[in-house]
Amino acid sequence: MEQTKTPVFDAAKAFVVPILSGGEKRCEVRFPSDEEWYAWARAQRTVRHFLGRGKPQSEDVDLPKINAELFAKIRTDKDGPEFDDAEAGMVIGRIERCAVASVEREGINYRIGMKVPGARVTHVLRMPTAKEMQDHERASTSVVAARRSVETRAFLEPSGALYDKLHVSHDGYAGAVPIVHKSAAVSEVIGYLAIEGDDDPE
């Protein structure tokens, strides 16, 4: 009896991404390199404006343009249907997606199951120390305050570095783990640990 092979995530293969926008549209893209994901994240900034009377308003500056630029780099079917900036953003969101399916504590480790494009993958990371989490938080964001606004930028590189420190094992990949998957796994562990740490002392 022939065994069914479990799909694995392969960043080297092409991805056909369908979206719904006035009907179904499809395009073929390659998965961005870590360097492209780094640049994409660094280019984004969120500005929080303070309008008075305690009414802040947040704005993601140039995000449609940033998504469209990455989409143009990774699209491989150049003769396919035209995608506007909003549709390009939908495609980037689809290939970036890491949906966490499960988190299990195993002693001092966490086993994270995730659904990623075309596969289900698993990461086992050890529990970070308080200092590792503190250093990661400081390095992951840049906050610049002005008179009536605050600008925030986020960086992926610190999540990659922390993932490599915490890494015990991973499964479901044909090659290296992409930075966006590392970042999602690290965020999930930190978030889960924060929930566990909220228990009142006895």
Language model region names:
Residues 17-18:
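The feature marks the first
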Residues 2-5, 12, 21, 25, ...:
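Short, surface-exposed, charged amphipathic helix/loop patches that serve as local interaction elements
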